[in-house]
Amino acid sequence: MGIFYRMFTNNFRTIRSLLLSVLLLSGLLTGCVSSNKLFKMDGDSGTKETLPVHVEVLVEMAEYCNKIYDDGEELGDNEFAYNVVQDRGVTIIIFRGPNNGRNVVTDLDARPFNDRKLSANIHRGFRDAATKLRDEIIENHALEESIILTGHSLGGAVAQIIGLWLEDDAYDVQIYTFGSPAITTASFGDAAIHFRMALRNAPVPLLPPIPYRHWGIAIDPETLTWSENNEIGDFTKIDARDHSIKEYLNILRKHEVTQSQTGR
């Protein structure tokens, strides 16, 4: 069981957690890992010309994620932080986790948890963190009907889970994640809108291992090609530099400049 503490810094709340560490052995992930709910997926894909979201929106979400790092203090291995912005009738919730996301993913309790609200198995450690963050947010903030959730790395993991819960509560939800790990063994094809940015050599999106899987519309920030098929990256070409939120932001800004110059 996780033990959570609360602290307040620089206008955003930090959840400090001591989560049970487990060894990610293949045997631990077998057994009751199949989902009781498999959502239909259309499997659409395309190029930047048919990208189903404006690049300016992706840049804005990346800027929010970058700002929560710049404005906040260094987080410990099992700490998560969030910030809430109210903007013209839309609630924007930004999440972040610790800087060493890859190590923390392997430390968290990775056993699948049968989430009855979603009728699906989700990552137990991410769910524990998301539960505490959701309770904090609901207790301290009035939420609009339209909610955008965004997060980088482990922040993207809790953004997904909380977004799915809020969508189940009839909120109008959109989720934007950058370099997030997988959170479920299910395919939430017809659930909340989720735009998932993942650089091809980033390490954290490759975790945790099968049977966990990604869901949503995967976007390659470098080419702006997109797909609902969520192909896995290559373990042999991992580059830790590709995981920085600043890397995502710099790449997306270049697309924004190119579009303004070409008028597209």
What is the predicted role of each segment?
Residues M1-I3, E145:
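N-terminal leader/targeting segments
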Residues Y5-L19:
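Bacterial N-terminal signal peptides that target proteins for export
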Residues L19-T30:
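Bacterial N-terminal signal peptides
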Residues V33-T150, L154-R264:
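Non-catalytic, mobile gating and regulatory segments of ester bond hydrolases
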